[in-house]
Amino acid sequence: MRIIALSDIHGQLPVISESAEVMFICGDIIPLKMQKNYPQSLKWLREEFIPHFNNMSVEQIYLIAGNHDFFFESARPQIISALFSGTKIIYLRNENVDYLDNDGNTWNIFGSPDCHIFGNWAFMYHSNIELEDFNKMHDDCDIMITHDAAYGQNDICKQDIWYNKHEHIGNPEMAEVLKKKHPKFHFTGHLHTSDHNVVDYNGTKTACVSLLDERYHMTYKPLILDIEKSGDYKLVNNENKMGTDA
């Protein structure tokens, strides 16, 4: 099954010409200038985000929110459900869902926006709540999408304009859950300076798929993979930065 994974667009709608069966969007989608404005966020989602992504050459899109997506934390579930009704987009908040691919394989997918606390942002909860949410993931999960990364999982924030040193800033509670549960694939966002390559984390193939760099410039390409139920994969785009051949 060919998939496209991306995250952290912060209102910058990417042009994606490639086609795939499924797309995963791992949060931080709403423009920074309106992130705390509910009416503006709703209008942008309805008039900009949904038409743009609904026109993509994919059959299904799974979306989670990020720590800048305050709308999704405050909106009633009925509002969100109505917003995406009749579109390709399925919104997940600590939920499991099954997807039947074109080859007849069933994929179990889990999505969570939860992040560990480091300021006054959306979806940041104490460790006991995060553990409860992450443990909702089924034991036989195939694909996990989260905004945060687990501690030690592609989570080194490089020294830049925001951080004074290289350090791990991943989620300890997520790491604890992933010691017991091993999804085949895990796609994350949140860290604009993280390594964007696919790496192995305790048997799980994982990648940070944010598109913006630390200065909020569109720098990285969406990740495109051909994935197998066995956990094997083939990288379709060999270069992950803009301006290089896919």
Task: Name what the model sees in each region.
Residues 1-4, 96-111, 139, 143, ...:
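Beta-strand-turn-beta hairpins that frame and shape the catalytic cleft
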Residues 10-15, 30-34, 64-75, 96-101, ...:
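Active-site environment of divalent metal-dependent phosphoester hydrolases
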Residues 6-102:
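Core catalytic region of metal-dependent phosphoesterases/phosphodiesterases
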